[in-house]
Amino acid sequence: MIFISPPFGNYLSIRNTVSIKGSYTLEPRSGLIMQILNTLRYSFKYYGWINKIGLKNPGIDYAIKNYDNKSIISIAILNKDEIPKLLEKIPRNMNLEINVSCPNLEQKMIENNIHKFINNERKWCIIKVSPYCTTKKLDEYYKYGFRQFHCSNTIPTKNGGLSGSSIIPHSTLLVAHLKNRYPNSVVIGGGGIKTKKEIDIYKKCGADYFSISTLCFHPILFYKFYKSVIKPGNF
């Protein structure tokens, strides 16, 4: 299965894929379109896209109102005080991806409580980690009760989050660690996927599923990927 990560998951619905909506915060953070236009740049130095979207979004109430429990909603928790409020708002059967990989987040303040989102009513309760996540931290997330992992988000730089092939060496190490140590974990491998070749790299490391996002910036490359991978289910 191919997952389409935000922001493209908000707009695309394609057979043989699952779109992840978001990321949503407790309160609205306006200015998404302008932030994309102002900060999205291609880096020829790193061969990838850099953005500083900064979690601009219409807020979790919008997601709850507009998406059913078949969707996967990505949430970002900015501080520990938001956790009980989000738990109260979000339906227990709404599928979630908890994004703990953005530099905006007070990670140390929230990670001791994020396991509260796990319950038997959710088919998906994924934790999305940074490329710089340590194996020790992955072990802690597993100990908290997480069994679904998304490796990984963009690489943090001074100019924003870097996507593209630079992520692959980091993500594959995380995928391999999880599948070697915790065979029952479900792992989505993502970052730098453009062709079947990258799919095979992640699959060799043990990834169960795969994710794309910035590939969608390239209509021609995305169409080729769709024709050769997504449409025939070649993954």
Where are these regions (language model features)?
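Hydrophobic alpha-helical segments and helix pairs
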Residues: 80-112
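Short beta-strand/loop segments at the ligand-binding rim of alpha/beta enzyme cores
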Residues: 1-4, 69-74, 121-133, 178-190
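Glycine/Thr-rich beta-alpha phosphate-binding loop at enzyme active sites
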Residues: 100-110, 131, 136-185, 219-225
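Surface-exposed amphipathic alpha-helices with a cationic face
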Residues: 64-68, 115-122, 142, 175-183, ...
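Glycine-rich tight-turn/loop motif centered on a GG-T
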Residues: 35-54, 104-116, 158-169
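Glycine-rich phosphate-binding active-site loops on the catalytic face of alpha/beta enzymes
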Residues: 21-29, 96-102, 148-158, 193, ...
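N-terminal capping/small domains of soluble enzymes
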Residues: 1-71, 76-78
